């Protein structure tokens, strides 16, 4: 449900902009006509083939892999009373002109000094979406500077950023109630409390990578999934929620994986091969085989029945879906890896105190060369289906731990491909080895 950074792919001027897909509430509610093939958003979809073509053009834009972006998300707390419920007025005051319009409708929503855009989630979590860069070093510099700017603004208002992937102090509480968030809360409430936990009490780190060329697509798509379980375990950072230990290394991923599996879980068969026949077809099929979470009507949001989006196209009842409906549906698909014209890796917990660079560097190193990525995927096949064990047990799961060790060692060997300076590289290596050999989480606990 979070917003991805500015698209990390460089495309020729004729390419359709990757950010036409609305992801956040503000973009979903203000999206104008679709720009894909000049199809007006209000055009009815009467043929599943047309929908499939649209999904392909929106979600898979191929080209040389060059750029990387991150989204950094945190829970927000009062510095001296971290368990105190957050007042949205205090958060809006702290953010000033950087506040999104979902929080302050009259805000200019200015970017931070180095270009990062601030958004706010339903529970008051704050996130920075970075501009894409062709250099991990540049990304580290600009994102770190924007984090400092954000931290200073919050500090002046008596607020601070959280350090884990779940709110360790407070139960989930929705403080933003626009149309999209209200509809999403109602839809997920039909399946229990996990929706509220996800919307209002979690914080993640998203790393966005180019899809790659047509030739690279299958490898990069498969690798993004196959690396998931060991990286979840290696960077698990949410063992506590609302004042109690949950028994999960990553309570955040436990919530996501079980929330609405057709929409949020990993692919049913992640071991279908390092080179799946057609990731575009697989994703398109999943989108069309998933029911809409909610539908936007002139009279307000409507919660539909169990019919899938593909069935809605075929029946055309109570009205045919439009491309605006399909855009909205795509924005409510929340799998661990989401194609948005680039690959959005969504399975990492928020990291504390600038340590987001560690998982970002690992992924950048592994994805820098196809040969490295092939080696990486070949070492993790035994753990490929262990999403839930990775989230629950972290590095205490021996199969996942073995895969994590292999990935970390390979990444350390290939960090030179990231262009990071020696000092940062040394920091990354030390952090990885500390977690692997001491089995420690960033918050200092052990498993």
Positions of predicted regions on the chain:
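Terminal catalytic/cofactor-binding subdomain
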Residues: 2-11, 19-24, 32-193, 201, ...
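Structured core elements
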Residues: 75, 206-208, 344-346
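Short, aliphatic-rich beta-strand segments
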Residues: 128, 286, 344-346
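Short glycine-centered, acidic/aromatic-flanked micro-motifs in structured strand/loop junctions
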Residues: 130, 209-211, 347-349
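Loop-rich catalytic cores of soluble enzymes, especially ATP-dependent carboxylate-amine ligases
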Residues: 162-333, 337-338
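Long, well-ordered mid-to-C-terminal structural blocks that present hydrophobic/aromatic surfaces
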Residues: 304-385
